[in-house]
Amino acid sequence: MGNLDSDGAGSVELLFKNQASLKLSITSNKAKIVDDYFEIKKRILYFDDPFVINNLSNRLYKANQVGNDHNSDNVSLLKNSIIDTSSADIRQAIVNKKLEDLKSSISTICKGNLFENEFGDYVYKEEGSDKAYFLKNLSSGLKTFVLFNTFLQSGVIESGATIIFDEPEIHLHPKWQLEFAKMIVQLQKALNLNILINTHSPYFLYALEVFVKKYGTLESTRYYFAHIEDRCPVIEDVSSDIERIYKTLFSPLQLLENVRDSL
């Protein structure tokens, strides 16, 4: 990585499961591929905002089609996921079989699906109920699971794909954080996904750590610690010493404990 105080170019090298690498040079916030690049044939998804689901209404959707950002992509994928009902081919049937346990877990929280009503608005309806809820009225936590479940049901999340979760715990109740962490681990194991998770929550991190051990994916899991050294960002593999991450994440709580003890 580069330094804002330096005129030199920054660099990033991405290694994909020890098989292929991609080197980038970054100057003035613009990235350039250094070496010959390889073709990424699987889908890459980036989740950082469950409220993107609100943009499914026709008027807002058209307004948000302009631009080339991940949220616009997610809106397009969501709309196509609702319209496309042809995912019951042989390959998808095999995937669905692998995901039976995961879908069972999701159904305890997300008990319905998205539909387009007669007015062209997208709504959420639970199975066995005639009540329809406008998406803007769903809780932020439920939005997270609805988004996740819609992509899962439609086959958007395919075997071998790459998913980036940017602080997925932010909008979730602590109990739902545990469920979501479990679902992420189950999903990775079932579909052999490449998953990158960024979190500032020791609670969510611990949940991931526990479920990784429970579902036997420890060998394919790495933990990285992002910090600053000499005014430069460093991303360090601390898989053998995860306590370094917990120590940093728990430090604000320790400050509160110190204040309380001084009262």
Where are these regions (language model features)?
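Charge-dense, low-complexity intrinsically disordered segments
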Residues: 93, 171, 195
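C-terminal lobe/lid and adjacent interdomain/linker elements of RecA-like ASCE P-loop ATPase modules
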Residues: 179-263
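Conserved D-loop-proximal element of ABC-family nucleotide-binding domains
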Residues: 173-174, 178
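Phosphate-coordinating catalytic segments in nucleotide- and nucleic-acid-processing enzymes
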Residues: 1-160, 229, 233-263
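Walker B catalytic acidic pair
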Residues: 166-168
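Walker B motif beta-strand of ABC-family P-loop ATPases
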Residues: 162-164
